[in-house]
């Protein structure tokens, strides 16, 4: 049994297709796995990965930078500020962003923007397999 999944950001639809399971991390409930027949749900996403397990067993992993997940009937929608498929992440750019954030934090460890930038860069690198 499958359901329809869409990952959408302001720039693009990064995934649209069938899936057997979606795994995400919410701010309120931690990691959660959605399968067909899941009760209706709306949650706030953390800066973390979203994993889509397709009917053929293959997995697609996305770096998601905050947003919302909604389960309604046979459809799951992930709406996020940024959604990047693992194979499309620019590793060099992510490493540079990480280095820049670490440099800013070495000068001011309370710089909230640098803390957020570091979390996003580390997520991109993790999802890209670095």
Q: How does the language model describe each region?
A:
Residues 83-130:
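Acidic/glycine-rich phosphate/pyrophosphate-binding loops and surrounding catalytic core
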């Amino acid at each position: 049994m499958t359901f329809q999944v869409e990952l959408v950001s302001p720039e693009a639809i990064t995934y649209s297709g069938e899936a057997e399971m979606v795994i995400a991390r919410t701010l309120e409930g931690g990691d959660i796995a959605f399968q067909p027949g899941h009760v209706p749900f709306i949650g706030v996403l953390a800066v973390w990965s979203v994993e889509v397990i397709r009917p053929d067993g293959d997995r697609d992993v996305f770096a998601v930078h905050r947003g919302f997940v909604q389960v309604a009937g046979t459809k799951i929608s992930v709406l996020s500020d940024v959604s990047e498929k693992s194979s499309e992440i620019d590793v060099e750019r992510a490493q540079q962003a990480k280095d820049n954030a670490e440099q800013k934090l070495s000068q001011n460890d309370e710089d909230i923007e640098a803390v957020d930038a570091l979390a996003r860069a580390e997520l991109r690198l993790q999802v890209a397999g670095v």
